[in-house]
């Protein structure tokens, strides 16, 4: 019905195969899906992935975009909308400060790590995108796509869409994760582009 033409991968990205992009023929819209490497095992590569992804999308401002994937970020979202990245640390009193895993401190500062994650997770608006789940559910919904061993929900999987969108529904389907098909719950997003 609407064939998709592949878009050349970002060769400067550490793992270019972790970003797949296509242009929908007969429509002025691109679809991008990514799997950002986890920082715990890849360190600065995660930061570089975010930086290259943002740069790639920022250079494509003339076309509407949908961006999906496993971003392995953020660490935490508060009900106020505040985002805590993996470049930050939260003290027992709740105070937030810039920090980075000591394992990676020689490769990447906490400031750079924080900025790289925010470039997409928080500053997606600069790319003409909205966070479909948050637009539909606000910040009081603390659903997640991945859970720690202590049961803490983390919202690592996202769908960002163009601003001219009518969102019908968006939720994390916990059943596939509970049935052990994946360690992540898929994000369901149904919407119309106006």
Regions found by a protein language model. Give the residues of each.
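Acidic carboxylate-rich catalytic motifs and surrounding loops in phosphoryl-/glycosyl-chemistry enzymes
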Residues: 8-11, 131-141, 171-176
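Active-site metal-binding loops of divalent metal-dependent hydrolases
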Residues: 36, 70-71, 185
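Short hydrophobic/aromatic beta-strand or adjacent loop that forms the aromatic wall/cage
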Residues: 16-21, 153-158, 182-188
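Structured beta-strand-rich core segments of catalytic domains in phosphoester-bond hydrolases
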Residues: 1-41
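Short proline/glycine-enriched turn/loop segments at secondary-structure junctions
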Residues: 146-150, 176-181
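Low-complexity, intrinsically disordered Gly/Pro/Thr-rich segments
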Residues: 166-177, 186
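Active-site beta-strand termini and strand-to-loop segments that position acidic
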Residues: 1-2, 22-27, 161-163, 182, ...
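Metal-dependent phosphoesterases centered on the DNase I-like endonuclease/exonuclease/phosphatase
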Residues: 51-156, 161-162
């Amino acid at each position: 019905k609407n064939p998709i033409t592949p878009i050349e991968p970002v060769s400067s990205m550490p793992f270019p195969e972790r970003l797949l992009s296509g242009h929908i023929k007969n429509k002025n819209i691109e679809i991008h899906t990514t799997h950002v490497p986890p920082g715990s095992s890849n360190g600065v590569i995660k930061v570089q992935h975010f930086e290259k992804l943002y740069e790639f999308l920022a250079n494509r401002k003339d076309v509407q975009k949908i961006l999906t994937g496993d971003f392995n970020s953020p660490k935490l979202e508060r009900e106020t909308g505040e985002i805590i990245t993996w470049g930050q640390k939260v003290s027992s009193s709740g105070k937030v400060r810039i920090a980075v895993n000591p394992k990676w401190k020689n490769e990447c500062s906490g400031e750079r790590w924080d900025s790289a994650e925010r470039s997409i997770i928080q500053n997606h608006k600069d790319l003409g995108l909205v966070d479909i789940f948050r637009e539909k559910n606000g910040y009081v919904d603390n659903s997640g796509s991945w859970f720690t061993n202590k049961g803490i929900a983390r919202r690592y999987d996202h769908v960002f869409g163009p601003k001219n969108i009518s969102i019908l529904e968006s939720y994390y389907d916990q059943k596939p994760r509970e049935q052990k098909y994946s360690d992540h719950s898929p994000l369901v997003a149904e919407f119309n582009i106006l």
